[in-house]
Amino acid sequence: EMSASLVGSEMCIRDRDQGCDKKTLAAIDERLNTQHGLVLNNPAFTKYYIQYGEISTYPGGYKENAGIFTHNNAWIICAAAYAGAGDQAFKYYSEIAPAFTEETSDIHKTEPYVYGQMIGGKDAGSDIGKPGNHFGQGKNSWLTGTAAWNMVAISQYILGISADFDGLKIDPSIPAAWDGMTATRQFRGATYDIKVSNPAHINKGVKSVLVDGNAIEGNVIPAFGDGKTHSVEVVMG
């Protein structure tokens, strides 16, 4: 599944300090995004190329040939959130998450509670004489690692609650419209009740952190390991 979307996610993470992340995300949004998710490549291959192998054997809009591989979408969600593009990350999450696709179930067709391996891309159906008539149709239910990867994307990258060597790191990358969020996380023998406030309505950035009412430096919560519940108050800014 080495593709435009995978290369894009790597560039966002590797080259963030050089500003390549913003250019890459803009190109991804312009060239790969659709209302049903991100296609792997664009345009689709229309004939077989021996040097490219399997990718060019599939009909346009299916599988690796410009299909919407949901597994790869999760990697772009992670990359967008890492780059601080919280609105973009959540938009991509909403395009493929089953909870958001009920209104298009007549197009999607697969079970409304599960991820499929892929969704028909913009070119899907052109092989049977009617361009794009399978665009948005889900395929191969359950046959994917998307659920696990999107759990990582939403919890560790968008909500920004992730394990760190020194403790529990809180670094949200959320839509600017959000006032904040709450979460409970069990971590290394303790429970953390986390409340994040976003008064400035930004996408990313932590201004202050209180743990059990006491200010700490940075945004990594110590691992108490005492079996107790600790309150964490985070203000973005």
Predicted feature descriptions by range:
Residues E1-I13:
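Single conserved hydrophobic/aromatic residue that forms the stacking wall/gate
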Residues S9-E10, H71-C78:
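Contiguous, well-ordered alpha-helical segments that form the cores/surfaces of helical PPI scaffolds
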Residues R14-D15, Y82:
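Alpha-helix C-terminal capping segments
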Residues Q18-G37:
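Carboxylate/His-rich catalytic cores and anion/metal-binding grooves
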Residues G19, K23, H71, D87, ...:
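Conserved active-site and cofactor/substrate-binding residues in soluble primary-metabolism enzymes
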Residues E30-T34, T46-Y49, T57-A66, W75-G237:
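Non-catalytic C-terminal accessory modules of carbohydrate-active enzymes
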Residues E54:
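Short, surface-exposed loop/turn segments at secondary-structure boundaries that line and modulate
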